[in-house]
Every structure is written in C-alpha cells, then in structure tokens.
C-alpha cells in the first residue's frame, strides 16, 4: 500500500497528458512535450516575449540557462539564432529538452549541455527563466518552480557579466508572484 497526495496525483496526470498531447506553442511552429517535473509552457506570455523582443545585432550565438523543456532555446533557434547552447543541471530536464529539440527538427541549432548554470565562453545573448518560488521543493514536480534560497537567480545574476560578449545582453525572465506573495 502507498499513499499519494491528491495534489501530487493531479500533477502526474496533468504531466502525462501534456507529454502525450504536447502543448501548442505558435512561436516554435509546433508543440512542446513536457516531462513530469519539468516546467510546462502552458502560459505563453514569457514565450511571446522571447519571440518578439529585439535580438542583439548580429546575434548568432545565445546561451539558454536552465533550459527545462527547451522552449526558450527553440524559440531563439526559430528566430534565426544559428547556435543556442542550452544548459541544465537536471537529467530529467535535459531528456525533455532533447526530445523537444528532436521533434522540432532543431538539433543542428541547439546544443544541450549538463552543467550548473553557464557553459564555457561568452555570448551576445544569455537568457534565463529561473524557477520563481524561493523555497525548498518537497516533490519532483516542485523542482520546476522552486529555487531554494534563490540559488539559481543569484548564480545567474552573479555570473552573467563573465559570460556576455562586449555589448551583449542578459535577459532575465522571471515571474513576480514571489514578491506578490511576500516570499522574496
């Protein structure tokens, strides 16, 4: 016998449906297939922002820090960035991103790398959409939205300058829900 919280069970069922059917994302002209425990792009505001914000002039290389499902890397590749290095430290996220990159036919443009935050080198564009709740996750599904002690956010902000080319841009895409809830 085992006991599973209803919230956890509903999360597993939702993740299964998203993975089976995919989430339509117009900015990539296709669908993203999220895995359980990897953030699903069910709200499109941040995706639309990446799809429409002006890219740095001549941007042929970008870093996507904490790629998760690979959605930001895919949007950048669809926009014409020739090489996107997408990083994550989580094997589940990298497997999810790989599946999505392959299904979207973007393997030539996107390199996936397991590392904690930044790859080596510098890029004219470095993008990060970190988890937005500064708390400790208690289940696998929460890793997609919980950033203990804002570790990822602080690491991105602290390391960004060392990974930008001169006149490069860092894009931090983050929800303000933690501020509204008094968590940050």
Give residue ranges: language-model regions.
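Glycine-rich S-adenosyl-L-methionine
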Residues: 140-165
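Conserved SAM-binding loop and adjacent beta-strand
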Residues: 14-17, 35-51
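Conserved beta-strand signature within the Rossmann-like core of class I S-adenosyl-L-methionine
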Residues: 167-174
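Short "lid" loop at the C-terminus of a central beta-strand within the Rossmann-like core
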Residues: 132-133, 150, 175-180
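Short alpha-helix
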Residues: 155-156, 181-184
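Residue-level signal for inorganic ion chemistry
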Residues: 129, 156, 170
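N-terminal auxiliary segments of SAM/dcSAM-dependent transferases
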Residues: 1-23
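Conserved SAM/SAH cofactor-binding pocket of Class I
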Residues: 43-128, 134, 138
């Amino acid at each position: 016998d085992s006991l599973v919280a209803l919230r956890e069970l509903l999360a597993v069922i939702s993740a299964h449906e998203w993975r089976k059917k995919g989430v339509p994302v117009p900015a990539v002209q296709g669908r993203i297939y999220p895995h359980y425990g990897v953030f699903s792009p069910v709200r499109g505001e941040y995706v639309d922002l990446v799809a429409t914000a002006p890219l740095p002039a001549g941007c042929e290389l970008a870093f996507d820090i904490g790629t998760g499902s690979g959605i930001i890397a895919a949007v950048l590749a669809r926009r014409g960035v020739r090489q996107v290095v997408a990083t994550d430290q989580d094997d589940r996220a990298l497997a999810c991103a790989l599946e999505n990159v392959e299904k979207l036919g973007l393997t030539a443009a996107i390199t996936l790398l397991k590392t904690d935050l930044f790859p080596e080198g510098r890029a004219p564009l470095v993008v990060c959409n970190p988890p937005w709740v500064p708390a400790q996750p208690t289940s696998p599904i929460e890793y997609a939205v919980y950033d203990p002690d804002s570790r990822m956010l602080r690491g991105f902000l602290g390391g960004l300058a060392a990974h930008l080319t001169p006149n490069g841009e860092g894009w931090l895409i983050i929800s303000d829900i933690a501020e509204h809830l008094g968590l940050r």
